[in-house]
Each structure stands twice: as C-alpha cells, then as structure tokens.
A protein has these predicted regions:
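Catalytic cores of nucleotide-sugar-dependent glycosyltransferases that transfer UDP/GDP/TDP-activated
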Residues: 1-301
C-alpha cells in the first residue's frame, strides 16, 4: 500500500534503465496489483504483450474484511482497497494473459470483476520437488540414500515435538502455516480443544511461522499467535499440543510430514480460504493423508 504513490516514478526510471541497456522485453509479466500497474505501463510503452498473475485479489479481500466487521473507511485508510480494485480492473482490461493456480481462482476471484472476460486465462498449478518430499517409508528401505542433513532434521524435529507431548507415540495432527487470520489456526485449536475423544486419540502440532519474541512481531501476527496460546490454555492442551517456535523449510518441514505419516496421523489445512495449498501437495507426497478447507485451491487438488 505504501508503494502506490511511487509507482509512476518507478515506471519512468525502469524505462530509462531498459533503454540504456539497449535490450527490450519480449513481454512483461506483473505479479500483484502494484507490479501489475507497472507492467501495463511498460507493456504499452514498449508495445509488448502483458501477462498478469494476481495471487490475491482486492474484491475478495474487501469481502473478507467486511465479514470481519471492518468499515470501508478503515479499509481504504489501511489498504487503499478501492484504489487497488480500480487498478485491478485496469489490469484485467489490458492483460493479454492471466495466469492462475486453479480454476476456482478464475471463477471465485477474477469472476468478481467487471473486466473478467477480457483476458485469456492459463491455469498453471504449482508443483513440488519429489526428491525432497518423498514417502516416509523410503527411509526404511535404504537409509544410505539420504543425506546427513535429512537424518539430522528427522531427529531434531522428533526431539522438538517430544518435549511438548506427554504421550509422543499417538498419531500426530500436523498444521503448518504462517500466523495469518485467514489460516484459521484458532479454529483448529478450538475444534481439537472441544473434542476430548480426539485428544485421547491424537496429538496436535501447530507450526505457525517463525518467531523469537511475539511482542516484537507485526500486530496481525501477534494477534493470531496470542489467540492460539489463549485457546491452548483455555482447553488445557498442555502435553497434547506442540507449538514450536522455528523450523527450516529445506530439511525440517519434509521431515515433519514424514514423522506425522509414520505415526498414522494427518496434515490439516483449516484455512478459511486457500488460493492453492502447496503444503497439501507436499504432505501427500510423503504419504501423509490430508484434510483441507472446502474453499479455493484444495478443491482442484
């Protein structure tokens, strides 16, 4: 939002830079509305096709914020939401191609716009590295195939989880996301906390981003994490719920999926809406069953 007043200056300087290089683009690809605005300016100047990937869209965000009780004046003050939506309409009117992750994205997000039928759409789902996210039972077949880093990550994550659990041998319900309201972490903790039978059957592990000091984090992240901790305390989930502070994505996240799969657990994505859901692909590739929101990309997956 803070970038909007500076985009025209950025366009001018980008044009000058490209002209100095003496090499001109064959096409321009913009991501998100601010870069989309820059993209349409550059494509018009150089006479090249323009491709757009929105990732998230303003009209859908506005609808969510209204549901949460935020007024339009506050939305425009904090997010310049109406300016964003107007810009997205301009982008769709001028885009030669729009790239999405799912068909749901075309129907439910771009479908809210007046200019939705102007561009062509291409659905290109994200993928994963199956050398990294391999089935959990491969570790049993040939341990020599896997690096020392992989084995260390497995042991490290087991140790991290076990320090939270009274009975670490139970199946593991695993959730992994950034601390964002839309990810519905508090809803997951509430559902687990209110189901005594589920608590008896399985442990819950929530990896909610990376943190050192919650007080030093952004206000929205602090709010999500505080809600999670309060819910954990309310339902007295000590010994049943793990809330580790950190993990690395290269080795420890794949190890977490395999640990959960080996315990006969599940991976859950409880988000209110999910544009795609890459973690669902990662988890399923390791042999871990998935439970997902019925909104957005998981329907395509």
């Amino acid at each position: 939002e803070l970038l909007w007043p500076h985009l025209d200056e950025y366009v001018d300087k980008t044009i000058k830079f490209i002209r100095r290089q003496g090499r001109y683009p064959d096409f321009v690809h913009g991501h998100y509305p601010d870069a989309g605005y820059v993209g349409i300016c550059l494509s018009e100047y150089f006479g090249t096709p323009f491709i757009y990937t929105g990732h998230s869209m303003g009209r859908a965000k506005k609808a969510r914020l209204l549901e949460q009780g935020m007024g339009e004046a506050e939305m425009n003050k904090r997010f310049k939401i109406d300016h964003r939506i107007q810009t997205e309409e301009q982008i769709l009117a001028r885009a030669d191609l729009v790239v999405t992750s799912t068909h749901h994205e075309i129907e439910k997000q771009y479908g809210l716009y007046d200019n939705r039928q102007v561009p062509r759409y291409a659905v290109i789902p994200p993928g994963i590295d199956i050398e990294t996210f391999y089935p959990y039972y491969h570790d049993k077949l040939d341990e020599s195939e896997h690096s020392e880093n992989t084995r260390y990550a497995q042991a490290s994550m087991l140790g991290e989880l076990n320090r939270f659990f009274l009975n670490p041998d139970k199946p593991l319900i695993l959730a992994l996301s950034r601390p964002d309201k839309r990810k519905n972490i508090s809803g997951l903790v509430k559902a687990y906390g209110e189901d005594l039978e589920l608590q008896a059957m399985a442990n819950l592990a929530v990896f909610a981003g990376l943190r050192k000091d919650i007080d030093a984090m952004a206000e929205n992240e602090k709010e999500v994490l505080t809600e999670m901790l309060l819910a954990m305390d309310k339902y007295d989930l000590y010994g049943k719920m793990a809330i580790p502070k950190k993990h690395d994505f290269e080795y420890e996240v794949p190890a977490l999926y395999r640990i959960a799969a080996e315990t006969k657990g599940v991976f859950i994505n409880p988000a209110l809406t999910e544009p795609f859901g890459l973690t669902l692909l990662e988890a399923s590739a390791t042999g871990l069953p998935i439970v997902a929101t019925d909104d957005g990309g998981p329907n395509d997956i």
